[in-house]
From Swiss-Prot:
Part of the 50S ribosomal subunit. Forms a cluster with proteins L14 and L19. This is Large ribosomal subunit protein uL3. Residues 133-154 are annotated as: Disordered. One of its GO terms (biological process) is translation. GO terms for molecular function: rRNA binding; structural constituent of ribosome. The gene is rplC. The keyword Signal does not apply. InterPro entries: Ribosomal_uL3 (IPR000597), Ribosomal_uL3_bac/org-type (IPR019927), Ribosomal_uL3_CS (IPR019926), Transl_B-barrel_sf (IPR009000).
């Protein structure tokens, strides 16, 4: 059964620390949330499911193709750089062109934050998959950080799909779940979220109502 999901696109500004009411230091990530605009509303009657599409970020109109220009014109909004669709049971309550700001969330609520992790380049199995590696003594000959066996010679006689090996690390879509919104600065459009969120400073993040827990 679908539930009511709130969401907003924003930019990760970086981390800092603040003090709570008990005078304890709280590490927080500052996210400049929105403003977003609603560019499309999907309903059960027209699309078979309910969702709302929101847009964020400035873009030169000359860089927008004709189909997208028509899409934004239909919603009577200027072109935006990023689009995302959020499935929610109350999609019909949204209207085209409606603005969504940081006030969507309140302090104390649980959220999931999605972003693109920092790219680390080509990495070995110890860094990429937390392998233990081989022995550190002199008896191990130049194989200290190798993965070990990747499959038998005759049986199975091949390398299984999905076997963890060296390769490019990071630059992937990552979601951190059940983070707490510590504070909301509605005037500046900022969300202060406890803990770290994926991605570099300046990266795009999606803040949504937590799928699990509360």
């Amino acid at each position: 059964m679908a539930k009511q999901i709130k969401g907003i696109l924003g930019e990760k500004l970086g981390m800092t620390q603040v003090w709570d009411e008990n005078n304890r230091v709280v590490p927080v990530t500052v996210v400049k949330a929105g403003p977003n605009v609603v560019t499309q509303v999907r309903t059960n009657d027209s699309d078979g499911y309910e969702s709302v599409q929101i847009a964020f970020g400035e873009i030169d109109p000359r860089k927008v193709n004709k189909p997208l220009k028509g899409h934004f014109a239909k919603a009577d909004v200027t072109p935006r750089r990023h689009l995302v669709e959020i499935r929610t049971a109350d999609a019909s309550e949204y209207t085209l062109g409606q603005e969504i700001t940081a006030e969507t969330f309140e302090a104390g609520v649980k959220v999931d934050v999605t972003g693109k992790s920092k790219g680390k380049g080509f990495a070995g199995v110890m860094k990429r998959h937390n392998f233990k590696g081989l022995g550190a003594g002199h008896g191990t000959q130049r194989k200290h950080r190798s993965p070990g066996s990747i499959g038998g010679c005759a049986t199975p006689g091949r390398v299984f799909k999905g076997l963890r090996m060296a390769g490019r690390m990071g630059n992937e879509r990552v979601t951190t779940q059940n983070l707490t919104v510590h504070a909301v600065d509605a005037e500046k459009g900022l969300l202060l979220i406890k803990g770290a969120v994926p991605g570099p400073n300046g990266g795009l993040v999606l803040v949504r109502t937590a799928a699990k827990g509360a």
